[in-house]
From Swiss-Prot:
The gene is tsaC. It comes from the Bacteria. It catalyses: L-threonine + hydrogencarbonate + ATP = L-threonylcarbamoyladenylate + diphosphate + H2O. PANTHER family: SUA5, THREONYLCARBAMOYL-AMP SYNTHASE. The keyword Membrane does not apply. One of its GO terms (molecular function) is tRNA binding. This is Threonylcarbamoyl-AMP synthase. Keywords: ATP-binding, Cytoplasm, Nucleotide-binding, Nucleotidyltransferase, Transferase, tRNA processing. InterPro entries: DHBP_synth_RibB-like_a/b_dom (IPR017945), Sua5-like_dom (IPR006070), TC-AMP_synthase (IPR023535), TC-AMP_synthase_SUA5 (IPR050156).
Length: 190
């Protein structure tokens, strides 16, 4: 079965996500692979595909902060901390928040926190809005290989039949910056 999706085929991507599949899609700098954050089956598939240990934790990417609220606890953020986060969103900055009490370990790994981002990439915004929630999002690359930046690179690493929302990345050179929402500490330079 050929799972490639025509450019902008958001409805087909949502159908695949609802069936616990992992899909590829362009983000601000590189292609991402993602899935339903509420499906342990889908997340396990993603982790196996990436050869990534569950204890490392994952990133959620969303169209809006409202989509992220069920997964994080932002109640302890001060007004200044909240402003620092919202000044960067939507955009290519990922923030680590305390996880909500109900966020599953397959998302947080060994941590009591969760990395989240409100994207400004139009295809991902449309995908998350159509899906009605965030996606688990990690760079589209197999273990030991560089992240994919083009449709052709995704096909070369994952195969011609890997389900993908085709489109261009946002053109940034580096993956998203990662910061602590409470302290502002920089974990990864963007």
């Amino acid at each position: 079965m050929n799972n490639n999706l025509p450019t902008g085929s958001i409805a087909a991507a949502v159908d695949l996500l609802n069936k616990e599949n992992v899909i590829a899609y362009p983000t601000e700098a590189v292609f991402g692979v993602g899935c339903d954050p509420d499906s342990e089956t889908a997340v396990t598939r993603l982790l196996e595909l990436k050869q990534r240990p569950v204890d490392k934790g994952l990133i959620l990417i969303a169209a809006s902060f409202e989509q992220l609220k069920p997964y994080i606890d932002d109640s302890i953020l001060t007004t200044a901390q909240r402003k620092a986060v919202f000044d960067c969103w939507p955009g290519p900055v990922t923030f680590v928040f305390p996880a909500s009490a109900t966020t599953p370990r397959w998302l947080t790994g060994r941590f009591d926190s969760l990395a989240v981002r409100v994207t400004d990439h139009p295809l991902v915004v449309a995908l998350c809005n159509a899906y009605g929630k965030p996606l688990v999002s990690t760079s589209a690359n197999l273990s030991g290989l560089p992240p994919c930046r083009t449709v052709e690179e995704v096909r070369a690493q994952f195969g011609d039949d890997f389900p993908m929302v085709e489109g261009a990345t946002g053109g940034r050179l580096n993956p998203s910056e990662i910061r602590d929402a409470l302290t502002g500490e920089l974990f990864r330079q963007g």
